[in-house]
């Protein structure tokens, strides 16, 4: 009898190992499974001149894992410049469109999956998420030139105000809280640490942005890169992610995005 039970247990375990991950894990207990529609807004493709590829991919992964449907959007306009990510300097011979660059995230389905930000209607979605990257301060706003007095891309400003007015969740990672704090009143956000407390694990080189959001009237809350801060009143969820520069602790960024998405999904169910 014991031998038979052991054999059955072994066979059951073997069957589970062969099952696709999606059959073993149906996501979190957040949102309306399979019926939550999220708009994800990109600003190009690449940390130094658009949306960071890790933050973009992690956002789409966690949305998928939690049963959300999502569509990707970007402004149909030219980038401020194109950065050579090897030399860390602008390329003088290149000029690229944010929407065309963001289509790189569409798994080769740009014509079907990529959307012009000017067409984004808050009435058609349950929430919006802005992953980070220097496109936030170069393409979606003039922060890289004007600092705290920056202006936002017209459609970026409209979308943020529309979702806020509709009491729908807004997810923001790394630099993206700058956008919301510039045009929405009395927000509570996190962009990580307020001082560059460098360690052998990483550092916080963009604390000037933290001071900027505070000068815009927002309340800043210190959080680790793997955490999220939830402004329940305004339904704004932020996570520091790559405000923290690290050479290899990317799992912290993955977890930070996951926590942000979890709370976005939770709030869509309210």
UniProtKB/Swiss-Prot annotation:
Record-linked SUPFAM superfamilies: Class I glutamine amidotransferase-like
Protein function: Plays a role in promoting mitochondrial enlargement in cone photoreceptor cells in a fusion-independent and ATP-dependent manner.
Subcellular location: Mitochondrion
Native source species: Danio rerio (Zebrafish)
Keywords: Mitochondrion, Transit peptide
GO CC entries: mitochondrion
Disruption of the gene: reported phenotype: Morpholino knockdown of the protein display decreased eye size and formation of smaller mitochondria in cone ellipsoid photoreceptor cells.
Tissue: Expressed specifically in the inner segments of cone photoreceptor cells of the retina (at protein level).
PANTHER family per UniProt: ES1 PROTEIN HOMOLOG, MITOCHONDRIAL (PTHR10224), ES1 PROTEIN, MITOCHONDRIAL (PTHR10224:SF15)
Keyword Transport: no
Gene Ontology biological-process annotations: mitochondrion organization
Cross-referenced NCBIfam families: PRK11780.1
The protein's name in its UniProt record: ES1 protein, mitochondrial
Leader sequence residues: none
């Amino acid at each position: 009898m014991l031998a038979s039970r052991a054999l059955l247990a072994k066979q059951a375990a073997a069957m589970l190992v062969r099952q696709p991950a999606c059959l073993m894990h149906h996501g979190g207990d957040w949102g309306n499974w399979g019926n939550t529609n999220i708009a994800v807004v990109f600003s190009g493709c690449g940390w130094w001149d658009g949306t960071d590829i890790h933050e973009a991919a992690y956002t789409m992964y966690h949305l998928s894992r939690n049963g959300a449907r999502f569509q990707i959007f970007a402004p149909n306009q030219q980038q401020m410049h194109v950065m050579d990510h090897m030399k860390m300097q602008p390329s003088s011979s290149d000029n690229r469109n944010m929407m065309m660059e963001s289509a790189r995230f569409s798994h080769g389905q740009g014509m079907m999956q990529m959307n012009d930000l000017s067409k984004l209607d808050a009435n058609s979605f349950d929430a919006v998420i802005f992953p980070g990257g220097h496109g936030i301060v170069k393409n979606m706003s003039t922060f890289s030139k004007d600092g705290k007095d920056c202006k936002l891309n017209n459609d970026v400003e409209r979308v943020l105000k529309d979702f806020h007015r509709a009491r729908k969740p807004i997810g923001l990672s790394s630099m993206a809280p700058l956008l919301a704090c510039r045009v929405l009143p009395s927000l509570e956000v996190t962009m990580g640490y307020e001082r560059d407390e460098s360690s052998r694990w990483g550092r916080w080189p963009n604390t000037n942005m933290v001071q900027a959001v505070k000068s815009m009237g927002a309340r800043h809350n210190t959080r680790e890169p793997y955490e999220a801060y939830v402004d329940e009143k305004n339904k704004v969820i932020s996570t520091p992610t790559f405000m923290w520069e690290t050479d290899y602790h990317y799992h912290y960024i993955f977890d930070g995005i996951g926590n942000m998405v979890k709370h976005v999904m939770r709030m869509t169910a309210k």
